[in-house]
């Protein structure tokens, strides 16, 4: 049960981190396109 709890927290942290990266890519994509935006297929204008 305790192990499952830690796995849940880890998954949430991972999702939040990805979300923050995505937002950063969208906002700053025009100035400095990051490698992660290319990997996820986000078009950089």
Curated annotation (Swiss-Prot):
InterPro entries: Lysis_col. Residues 1-17 form the signal peptide. Its main location: membrane. Keywords: Cell outer membrane, Lipoprotein, Membrane, Palmitate, Plasmid, Signal. It comes from Escherichia coli. Pfam families: Lysis_col. A lipid is attached at residue 18 (N-palmitoyl cysteine). Lysis proteins are required for both colicin release and partial cell lysis. A lipid is attached at residue 18 (S-diacylglycerol cysteine). GO terms for cellular component: cell outer membrane. It is found in: Cell outer membrane. It is a lipid-anchor. The gene is lys. This is Lysis protein for colicin E1. GO terms for biological process: cytolysis.
